Amino acid sequence: MVCVPCFIVPVLLYLWHKFVQPILLKYWNPWEKKDADGNMIKTEPKNPFDCAGGVCRWAGKKTAVPPGHDPVGPTVAADTATSDAVDDAASSKKTL
């Protein structure tokens, strides 16, 4: 059986950090940044997914296809050659 403090303390810590602490920090926050006059410096949290100034930091880089490179993939002849080899291997196993 689990002792009562081993169950109650983690639950209370979770409730404190999830619900109570954010409410209290809105009214009393000793760690907030202040200017020389003692006024709170308001900074909005920066969202890393915002696209500011027409530039998105998380957009994928577009790469140009080199000349002479086939972006489609291997040719049909190469696909049939590999499938013939697979069929030959399968038929040889059946004959044994």
UniProtKB/Swiss-Prot annotation:
Pfam families, sorted: DUF4512
Region (Disordered): 65-96
Compositional bias of kind Low complexity: 75-96
InterPro entries, per the entry: UPF0729_C18orf32-like (IPR026776)
Record-stated family: Belongs to the UPF0729 family.
Protein name, UniProt field: UPF0729 protein AGAP000931
Lineage of origin: Eukaryota, Metazoa, Ecdysozoa, Arthropoda, Hexapoda
